[in-house]
């Protein structure tokens, strides 16, 4: 296990399940685990923000979502620049060298997840559709599609 492992989605949904069972102490523990800061910003950061909201830490949640939007916009604006490749960082496969396409997909997917956390569904759908045009089989798009109408996302 490394510091970069992101498990917020697992703990967030576990917290939701405990909440449904009215096991509030266990739900709070799960939400606290989901709210732990991880160094990498990704779509999974949405679940950290949602957990922070559940814990009554709305300002922190807003900062997480704002950071997601900032990183997403950076991908989109600087679509022709490669990201830093360090240990544990994602790196393209040999057949994924269209860096502009990759950055546009990554930026729009991340933006969509952040907007989902802000309950801006129409803007989120528009962002995910831009990504879908470029990479229709990206797994993150399927995840987004399964989340957009789930009540557990809107805290």
Residue ranges and their predicted role:
Residues 1, 37-38, 72-79, 135:
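Alpha-helical junction/boundary sensor with strong preference for TPR arrays
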Residues 7, 41, 58, 75, ...:
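Residue-level recognition of tetratricopeptide repeat
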Residues 5, 39-41, 46, 102-104, ...:
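Residue signature of alpha-solenoid helical repeat architecture, marking inter-repeat boundaries
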Residues 1-4, 94-100:
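Flexible helix-coil transition and linker loops at the boundaries of alpha-helical arrays
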Residues 6, 12-13, 47-49, 54, ...:
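"A position-specific structural signal for the A-helix of alpha-solenoid helical repeats
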């Amino acid at each position: 296990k490394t510091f970069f492992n992101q498990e917020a989605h697992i703990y967030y949904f576990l917290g939701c399940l405990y909440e449904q069972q009215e096991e509030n102490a266990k739900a709070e523990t799960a939400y606290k685990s989901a709210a732990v800061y991880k160094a990498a910003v990704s779509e999974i950061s949405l679940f950290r923000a949602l957990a922070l909201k559940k814990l009554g830490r709305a300002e922190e949640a807003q900062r997480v979502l704002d950071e997601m939007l900032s990183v997403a916009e950076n991908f989109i604006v600087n679509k022709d620049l490669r990201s830093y490749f360090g240990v544990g960082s994602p790196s393209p496969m040999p057949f994924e060298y269209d860096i502009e396409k990759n950055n546009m997909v990554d930026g729009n997917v991340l933006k969509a997840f952040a907007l989902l956390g802000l309950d801006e569904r129409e803007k989120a759908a528009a962002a995910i559709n831009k990504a879908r045009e470029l990479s229709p089989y990206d797994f993150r798009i399927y995840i987004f599609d399964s989340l957009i109408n789930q009540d557990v996302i809107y805290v």
